[in-house]
């Protein structure tokens, strides 16, 4: 049965979420300063609305997962299916297989999904729908969506309220306006796109092409990345599970290092452009002696360098544990001409293995400066073990809230948005805003200061 006001609390359109809640009161204007463009930005609060605009029995929804694996993918899929089915009575739900290419593939037919089929998916790692990198052919994807868009809207012209980009003196409330007359004459499909920053950029292109063609299709993104590098929202799903699983690798590295003479345990964690997993895993473990992230450059030799620090730590404790994010130190690793140009299927530069490089460099250093002395480096790369696990309890709950927020938004008439928490409150954020934003570790804030306090590592600033 479709959601109704008598069934649950609903959100009013006047309820908004501020993007920024921390202000510099020492400035002349304080919280009312116009110097920061984020100060007056707010987003509509996520949640069910009084009115829905689609006849559930005629509504078709498509769900797709793109990019790399991440804990919680199956939970999001499950909750989208269950939410659409149980909260709104939608009975036509399709799972697009193998990522974006599944929209137009002649060999990977969509799966028909229902609550019984997805009942235990939240206990599984990976994605049952399968995923892939690349395969983004904008026109083939939108052609496929347009061909299958045959849902009828519910409501009359004067019942339907669409939200445009509207700015008052205090808040900017970004959302998306559709053409009412075109909408009432056409069919409607809902597309739920689950993926990371690259996938969100693809979703923006899909949404823009759909708008250009004037076909009314609801497009919503659900941000996914274990790296936690998606901007604006508080965090992406799978991140907390990744931090939890990283503890096992760090603990193993600590045991190996502690059990050897002059032993170093080296752990490489995920994080191409950001070091959030390495940072949080370091703070959670308290076994780490040094944490290296992409946002903080480091150097090996010389005063205040990594080698000097590890040498002193081995003299003091007899062992050390080093955590490095995969994107750290990439500018220090020698590359061939071919490696400089190598890209993966998503168009990203292929990173070299910083862990293997560090292991080699540390062995060279020890052989040079401590010939004949015992030394060992145990290198652990848990990347695929972490990516493949099911979501933990916290991420499972988070995935449920993300999925249900997305459903409520599409059913209320929003399109071209991402659902996610801002300052602890769930909001509807324009896809383009999220696709353009990043979430780097701020090495000048308190979290990085905590890392420096816990590890006593150098700041790697050359004098």
What does each of the following model-derived ranges do?
Residues 56-64, 99-102, 120-129, 145, ...:
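Gly-rich Lys/Arg/Thr-decorated short loops/hinges at beta-loop-alpha junctions or inter-strand turns
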Residues 1-12, 50-104:
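N-terminal phosphate-binding or glycine-rich loops at protein starts, especially the Walker A/P-loop
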Residues 66-68, 95-101, 133-134, 158-159, ...:
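Short, ordered loop/turn segments at secondary-structure junctions
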Residues 52-57, 62, 86-88, 119-123, ...:
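Solvent-exposed alpha-helices and their adjacent loops that cap or buttress functional pockets
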Residues 13, 19-55, 101-160, 171-189, ...:
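Glycine-rich oxoanion-binding loops at beta->alpha junctions
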Residues 144, 155-156, 193-195, 201-205, ...:
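Accessory alpha-helical/coil subdomains and C-terminal extensions
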Residues 70-80, 103-104, 136-141, 156-164, ...:
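Short glycine/serine/threonine-rich phosphate/pyrophosphate-binding segments
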Residues 1-16, 338-463:
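C-terminal non-catalytic interaction/assembly regions of soluble proteins
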């Amino acid at each position: 049965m479709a959601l109704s006001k008598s069934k649950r609390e609903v959100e009013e359109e006047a309820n908004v979420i501020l993007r920024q809640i921390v202000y510099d009161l020492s400035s002349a204007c304080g919280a009312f300063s116009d110097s920061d463009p984020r100060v007056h930005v707010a987003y509509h609060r996520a949640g069910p609305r009084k009115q829905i605009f689609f006849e559930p029995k005629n509504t078709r929804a498509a769900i797709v997962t793109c990019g790399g694996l991440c804990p919680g993918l199956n939970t999001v899929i499950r909750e989208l299916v269950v939410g659409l089915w149980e909260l709104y009575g939608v009975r036509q739900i399709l799972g697009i297989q193998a990522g974006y290419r599944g929209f137009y593939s002649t060999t990977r037919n969509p799966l028909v999904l229902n609550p019984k089929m997805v009942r235990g998916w939240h206990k599984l790692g990976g994605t049952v729908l399968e995923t892939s990198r690349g395969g983004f052919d904008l026109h083939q994807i939108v052609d496929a969506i347009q061909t299958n868009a045959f849902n009828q809207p519910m409501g009359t012209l004067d019942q339907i309220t669409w939200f445009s980009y509207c700015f008052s003196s205090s808040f900017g409330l970004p959302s998306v306006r559709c053409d009412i007359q075109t909408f009432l004459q056409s069919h409607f499909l809902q597309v739920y796109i689950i993926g990371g920053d690259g996938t969100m950029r693809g979703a923006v292109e899909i949404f823009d092409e759909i708008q250009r063609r004037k076909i009314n299709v609801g497009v919503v993104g659900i941000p996914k990345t274990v790296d936690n590098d998606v901007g604006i929202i508080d965090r992406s799903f799978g991140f907390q599970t990744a931090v939890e699983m990283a503890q096992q690798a760090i603990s193993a590295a600590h045991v190996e290092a502690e059990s050897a003479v002059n032993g170093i345990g080296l752990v490489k964690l995920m994080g191409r452009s950001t070091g959030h997993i390495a940072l949080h895993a370091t703070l959670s473990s308290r076994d780490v002696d040094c944490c290296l992230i992409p946002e903080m450059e480091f150097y090996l030799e010389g005063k205040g360098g990594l080698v000097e620090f590890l040498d002193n730590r081995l003299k003091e404790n007899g062992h050390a544990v080093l955590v490095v994010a995969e994107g750290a130190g990439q500018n220090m690793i020698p590359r061939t001409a071919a490696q400089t140009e190598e890209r993966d299927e998503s168009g990203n530069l292929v990173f070299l293995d910083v862990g293997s490089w560090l292991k080699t460099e540390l062995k060279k250093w020890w052989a040079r400066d401590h010939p004949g002395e015992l030394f060992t480096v145990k290198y652990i790369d848990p990347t695929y073990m972490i990516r493949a696990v099911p979501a933990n309890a916290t991420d499972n709950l988070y995935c449920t809230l993300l999925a249900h927020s997305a459903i409520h938004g599409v059913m209320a008439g929003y399109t071209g948005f991402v659902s996610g928490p801002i300052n602890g409150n769930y909001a509807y954020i324009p896809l383009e805003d999220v696709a353009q934003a990043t979430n780097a570790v701020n090495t000048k804030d308190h979290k990085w200061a905590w890392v420096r306090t816990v590890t006593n590592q150098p700041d790697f600033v050359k004098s």
